[in-house]
């Protein structure tokens, strides 16, 4: 092992080891060499080399998504750091822990025309829950500091003994910073940023640690707030809706699921990314609600469907239709359960009960139950939609919607499915997938920019093989994600290529003209074939229903290389069929 002789770099590595932050994603550079070499030469760390920092950020996010532990990101100084920003914002809103460590020039070299320098302090602003700048060591390259002591970190009059005292204080302060910052990311499951100034030389190492760090951790797990059981909101209601957003599998125990399923006055709505598979819960939310908007008696129907008490669990809600419904037909009260952020998504105000959902329902369900049958209108509408859905799909020509209907029964069980944003995740929400699969999507910021990199990051830690289902724009946008030596042979990508942003065609007010085609839909004629070959993927293509059936038969079989299946569909036809789909369901 090689320990950097710069104390601050060595301290960071020792603290990451102490906190068991063992996954480290490193992008190349010279200013971060003390950290890169120190981490990579230590067998306790699993280090990944990713050149493109934007891709590296999402790759790290995918790792943390699966491990539920902070992943460390290490980059050099300058614009390299800024490329992390999209992933940092996504991690912040998806509540995924990351530790960003940026190497920097000493302060006196900033904004004087020195190379590869920018203002790195707090560049992520409110999108991290903590930023700290480590103090520069004074026992490393002391002469250089004194010669260019523009930041005055060493008084000119200091003697050797005073210099040692100053370094001891610097070490104590830096350890305090690391302790506080690492506890923040663990406690809040959000990203933090640590900026570290390094004076040259950067390539001096020793075989053994030259410092001893404190044993202090003072980290405690989150405690449930039992005072919530005294809330006046916990009482009998005729109509209770429990709405699950993005969540990991296992957020509800089987006993809790069984109890909720037996309550007629409680309706549970789940999204694809909720990873809840109980058949008595209502999925495919847009399929249930969107057609109701088209009915003449929509107001009467929505008043039947609206809850008195809304309980939300988990993260971001994907369905625009449930947001619209609950903003228009307001519940009396809104409670959010769990230690994650409570968001006032429905403009009603939200009471945050910081308690495990299983404990909450175990202790309070009897008080919430009533004899009113709130489930009946939901069951009736669900059955009606299911019949119309099946009838419409049976006569459907090859299109985006047809592709997703074919994937529904052909994705093998025990797959981790990563889904890109825009139309892809919204199509996914219209179907049921194998209950043994897990489904994830970057819904924190809902961007198309890092889906491939996130999926590859997830694949290195997932216990199941990983399938990415993505649209063409998202795939090409993040094509640098494929520039990665850590891709497993079991990794699969399905690209639905309709030659542009087809989702925009179904939005109200879209005009199908030259300007919209070029600047909104951004139509193109690109194929994924050459990218697949360049990055060592097996490539196949389907352009028809029969062709897709044949390709899917072999696509998931074990192979020596990862695979890309490109499915070509017609954008105009697909958008037209999706509009008619909701009309036919009403």
Question: How would you describe each model-predicted region?
Answer:
Residues 9-17, 27-31, 35-36, 381-463:
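Active-site diphosphate/adenylate-binding microenvironment
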Residues 2-3, 139-165, 324-423, 529, ...:
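Phosphate/pyrophosphate-binding active-site segments
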Residues 4-90:
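N-terminal cofactor/phosphate-binding cores enriched in small/glycine residues
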Residues 90, 101, 108-130, 137-147, ...:
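Thiamine diphosphate
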Residues 22-26, 46-48, 66-105, 302-314, ...:
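A short, small-residue-rich loop immediately preceding and capping a beta-strand
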Residues 3, 149-168, 172-237:
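Conformationally flexible catalytic loops at phosphate/diphosphate-handling active centers
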Residues 83, 244-335, 434-463, 476-480, ...:
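Glycine-rich, anion-gripping cofactor-binding loops and their flanking helix/strand elements
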């Amino acid at each position: 092992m090689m320990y950097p002789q710069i104390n601050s770099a060595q301290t960071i590595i020792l603290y990451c080891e102490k906190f068991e932050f063992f996954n480290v994603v490193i992008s190349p550079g010279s200013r971060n060499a003390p950290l890169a070499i120190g981490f990579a030469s230590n067998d306790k760390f699993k280090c990944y080399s990713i050149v493109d920092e934007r891709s590296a950020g999402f790759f790290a996010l995918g790792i943390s998504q699966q491990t539920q532990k902070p992943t460390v990101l290490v980059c050099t100084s300058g614009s390299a750091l800024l490329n992390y920003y999209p992933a940092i914002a996504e991690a912040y809103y998806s509540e995924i822990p990351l530790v960003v460590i940026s190497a920097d020039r000493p302060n006196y070299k900033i904004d004087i025309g020195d190379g590869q320098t920018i203002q790195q302090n707090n560049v992520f602003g409110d999108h991290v829950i903590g930023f700290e700048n480590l103090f520069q060591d004074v026992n490393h390259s002391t002469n250089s500091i004194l010669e260019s002591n523009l930041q005055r970190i060493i008084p000119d009059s200091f003697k050797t003994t005073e210099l040692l005292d100053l370094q001891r204080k610097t070490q104590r302060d830096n350890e305090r910073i690391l302790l506080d910052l690492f506890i923040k990311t663990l406690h809040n499951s959000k990203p933090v940023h640590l900026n570290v100034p390094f004076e040259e030389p950067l390539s001096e190492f020793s075989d053994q640690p030259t410092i001893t760090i404190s044993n202090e951790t003072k980290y405690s797990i989150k405690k449930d707030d039992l005072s919530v059981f005294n809330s006046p909101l916990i009482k009998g209601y005729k109509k209770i809706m429990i709405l699950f957003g993005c969540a990991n599998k296992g957020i509800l125990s089987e006993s809790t699921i069984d109890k909720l399923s037996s309550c007629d006055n409680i309706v549970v709505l789940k999204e694809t990314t909720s990873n809840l598979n109980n058949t008595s819960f209502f999925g495919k939310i847009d399929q249930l609600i969107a057609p109701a908007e088209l009915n003449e008696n929509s107001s009467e129907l929505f008043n039947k469907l609206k809850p008195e008490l809304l309980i939300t669990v988990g993260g971001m809600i994907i369905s625009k239709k449930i947001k619209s419904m609950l903003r228009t037909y307001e519940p009396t009260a809104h409670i959010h359960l769990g230690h994650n952020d409570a968001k006032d998504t429905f403009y009603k105000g939200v009471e945050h009960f910081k308690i495990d959902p299983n404990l909450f329902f175990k202790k309070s369900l009897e008080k919430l139950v009533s004899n009113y049958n709130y489930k009946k209108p939901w069951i009736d509408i669900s059955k009606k939609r299911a019949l119309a859905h099946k009838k419409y799909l049976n006569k459907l020509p090859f299109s985006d919607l047809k592709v997703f209907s074919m994937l529904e029964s052909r994705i093998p069980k025990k797959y981790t499915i990563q889904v890109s944003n825009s139309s892809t995740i919204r199509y996914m929400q219209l179907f049921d997938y194998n209950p043994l699969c897990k489904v994830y999507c970057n819904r924190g910021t809902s961007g198309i920019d890092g889906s491939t990199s996130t999926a590859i990051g997830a694949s290195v830690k997932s216990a199941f093989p990983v399938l990415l289902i993505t649209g063409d724009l998202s795939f090409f946008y993040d094509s640098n994600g494929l520039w990665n030596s850590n891709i497993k042979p079991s990794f699969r990508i399905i690209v639905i290529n309709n030659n542009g942003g087809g989702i925009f065609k179904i939005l109200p007010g879209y005009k199908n003209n030259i300007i919209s085609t070029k600047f909104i839909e951004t139509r193109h004629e690109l194929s994924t074939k050459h990218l697949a070959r360049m990055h060592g993927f097996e490539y196949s293509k389907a352009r028809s229903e029969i062709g897709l059936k044949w390709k899917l038969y072999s696509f998931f079989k074990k192979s020596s290389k990862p695979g890309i299946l490109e499915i070509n569909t017609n954008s105009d036809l697909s958008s037209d069929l999706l509009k008619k789909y909701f009309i036919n369901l009403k």
